[in-house]
């Protein structure tokens, strides 16, 4: 059962951290970023977290309601000039929050780097510091692992709903999917993340396959990497040391 695996997403420090991660793909001034696509990605991510039955802080849902308000006002036909001004003000306030958080995070990272340098000077070895940085990079990539699956689930969600029939749904277990993934990685040591789901048309199978992959990653049987921001995620079977 999916509930048997306890997974905590600790990479995002809050909804603004998630939004900052989403707007960073545009590589432009925050106040010029198109908000509707960002809002859609945020809502897809939240929906995916629900699908995976993962714990979600209330602040994420509060932000989601605010984003849905902005999106709905954007999609409504123009009513009055005041309506437009109010909508633009809501968008500006949100982007200002994200920008303020970005500045705060940059300052926090600078202070953390300074702290690491001081710790290195007094006690830590160079090897220990490199190890810490490696873990940080891996954690950062984990954000995109969930975002990538969110996109896959959203793309297939409508098709899955349309394909519902009276035929009893096939049951999928994490144990079965772990076995299936192990077979795949035995035949093919390296594969693209998206390839794992290309032949899946059932929502339960998609979710169970993803949970099985997380279990393999947690047990250090599979590693994942990403060459560039929002690029293709590559999975690789880790060699078992004798």
UniProtKB/Swiss-Prot annotation:
InterPro entries: ScpA, ScpA-like_C. Disulfide bonds: none annotated. Pfam families: SMC_ScpA. Keywords: Cell cycle, Cell division, Chromosome partition, Cytoplasm. Transmembrane segments: none annotated. Participates in chromosomal partition during cell division. May act via the formation of a condensin-like complex containing Smc and ScpB that pull DNA away from mid-cell into both cell halves. Belongs to the ScpA family. This is Segregation and condensation protein A. It comes from Lactococcus lactis subsp. cremoris (strain MG1363). The gene is scpA.
């Amino acid at each position: 059962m999916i509930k048997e695996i306890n997974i905590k997403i600790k990479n995002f420090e809050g909804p603004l951290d998630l939004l900052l991660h989403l707007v960073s793909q545009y590589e432009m001034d925050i106040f010029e970023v198109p908000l509707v696509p960002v809002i859609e990605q945020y809502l897809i991510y939240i929906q995916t977290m629900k699908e995976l039955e993962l714990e979600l802080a209330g602040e994420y849902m509060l932000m989601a309601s605010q984003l849905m308000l902005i999106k709905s006002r954007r999609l409504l036909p123009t009513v009055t000039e005041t309506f437009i001004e109010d909508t633009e003000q809501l968008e500006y306030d949100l982007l200002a929050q994200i920008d303020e958080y970005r500045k705060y995070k940059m300052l926090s990272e600078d202070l953390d780097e300074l702290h690491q340098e001081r710790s290195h000077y007094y006690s830590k070895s160079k090897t220990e510091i490199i190890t810490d940085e490696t873990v940080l990079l891996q954690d950062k990539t984990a954000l995109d692992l969930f975002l990538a699956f969110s996109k896959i689930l959203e793309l297939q969600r409508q098709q899955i709903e349309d394909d519902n029939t009276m035929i009893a749904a096939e049951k999928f277990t994490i144990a079965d999917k772990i076995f299936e993934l192990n077979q795949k990685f035995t035949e093919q040591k390296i594969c693209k993340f998206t390839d794992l789901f290309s032949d899946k048309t059932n929502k339960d199978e998609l979710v169970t396959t993803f949970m099985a992959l997380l279990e393999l990653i947690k047990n250090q049987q599979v590693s994942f990497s990403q060459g560039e921001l929002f690029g293709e995620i590559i999975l690789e079977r880790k060699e078992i040391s004798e």
